[in-house]
């Protein structure tokens, strides 16, 4: 069970009374919105940095087996970085996937409507053309997402922050979740 308050003060509750109960025709699930700030910086981390930090066989004997998550991107394998379970290799692909899965819009990346084989009405429904979102619009959204800056750190008590950072390293989180990265060059956003 999970419960809490939305900013407007509206109470919400999710309770699984019987997790083995079959789902009905319609199923819903709670979602946590992904963090959007700083995604442009993550997109610019060179693949070599991520591959270099991987240790799938625990060669350094620290009991952590960090792995690179590879995804199919067109005809090539790339590192998954964005979306649930890191299923998208770039911020542009993540945005196109969100337009397809969350909004039902086609792009040059995802040309087919978000319909299953069992939804013939969905496949024949009117739409805004193919693709519905132009490459220039997809690129504009990607540029906007790339430029969303990480806010300044707001820490009232720096000693508490430093203790948290120290614990993050001590328990081994920093072995996979590298605290500092250097971005690669960006032609569109050279200041990143």
Where do the PLM segments sit?
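Periplasmic c-type cytochrome electron-transfer domains
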Residues: 1-192
């Amino acid at each position: 069970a999970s419960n809490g308050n939305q900013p407007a003060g509206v109470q919400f509750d999710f309770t699984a009374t019987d997790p083995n109960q079959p789902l009905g025709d319609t199923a819903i699930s709670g979602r946590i919105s992904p963090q959007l700030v700083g995604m442009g910086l993550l997109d610019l981390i060179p693949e070599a940095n991520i591959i270099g930090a991987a240790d799938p066989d625990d060669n350094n004997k620290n009991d952590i087996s960090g792995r690179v998550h590879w995804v199919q991107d067109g005809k090539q394998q790339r590192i998954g970085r964005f979306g649930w379970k890191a299923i998208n290799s770039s911020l542009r692909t993540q945005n196109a996937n969100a337009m397809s899965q969350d909004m039902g819009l086609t792009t040059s990346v995802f040309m087919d409507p978000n319909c299953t084989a069992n939804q013939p009405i969905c496949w024949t429904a009117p739409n805004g053309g193919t693709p519905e979102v132009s490459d220039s619009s997809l690129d504009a959204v990607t540029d906007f997402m790339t430029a969303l800056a990480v806010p300044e750190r707001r820490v009232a008590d720096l000693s508490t922050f430093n203790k948290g950072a120290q614990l993050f390293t001590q328990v081994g989180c920093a072995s996979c979740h590298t605290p500092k990265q250097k971005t690669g060059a960006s032609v569109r956003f050279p200041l990143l």
